């Protein structure tokens, strides 16, 4: 069993009672896991949307998710002075698999970044929590002694989400394209749009935010005030280069090109926008997270490996919590997952200096902040997904990386990064600045 005091694996065998003897073998304590550093690409408005200034989006539309992941991995290696030869495993989240080579996922991203072909690589999906899950999975590998250095991250290109035709297998042979003029008879499906609907509960993701807001008494005014604050904080972070140290360029596209934020947002202007699901809805284009393209990656190591390498880690991973909940209120996932992570860490809300809560929707974030009893001055202090956007699998890694840098910047100790997850889940991670 796992000793709750020292996290050592204890194996024992009890002999017959007449033999007064107990055999015990204690394995070495599990390694602590540290976040050495990382990098992310700019998060840029998708091709189908409009930037905050009203211009058409799509700065990253021609970079597949795998290419963005490759760039983020390269950036993480460079920013941490980590040799590709020292990497034991690559774990990358990829939720909305949109490119023609998507099935190869982390493998192509890692090989493209120069990781040796002998290194195993894993692609995973916990949808919006994938970027945190990849860090959890990497940490578990290290704690079990299967690796010492892991690249964890997430990658997404929403611009490349295809329109698809289902039910064509009985008409066209493998590898043969449909003839022009015949394909529309079956009906074309928007792959991005259909994946915003959870068929298990019959709700769009935005409707789960409306549902939890209804249950928790969140108002439209509170929602738009939070959204305006997110836009303002995001603009401040871009203008004052707060995120510059974590961003790696994609070609000539850098941290100043993060373009979803609407700089002149006020609660009054946001309050004039039409809601998505009728008069009872709170969700609008101005208080929901942006659809953007981007990727992020971090280098995590065992504490002993980091010490031997002469690293100066940003933080150590303290605990994590992953939960399931009613699909119709998936947006509430940060609350039970954060409580679980804090309980495992032996910490309370008062111990946490900074929170990074994914703003899938402003109303959902307000509900979580209120229910956890958080001080808004400690939450998403540099902006969040309403302002910067939410590239699904990449978001969680950005939350953790941004949190680690912010704890250093603010001289804080403990922080929590958390996200809701489509389908009815939540994930949270507690880290401690070093």
What kind of region is each of these model predictions?
Residues 28-95, 99-109, 113, 208-220, ...:
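Conserved active-site "lid/cap" helical segment
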Residues 63, 94-150, 185-188, 200-204, ...:
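Conserved catalytic cysteine-centered active-site region
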Residues 124-156, 164, 213-242, 297-304, ...:
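Active-site-proximal alpha-helical scaffold in enzymes
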Residues 149-211:
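Flexible glycine-/small-residue-enriched beta->alpha junction loops
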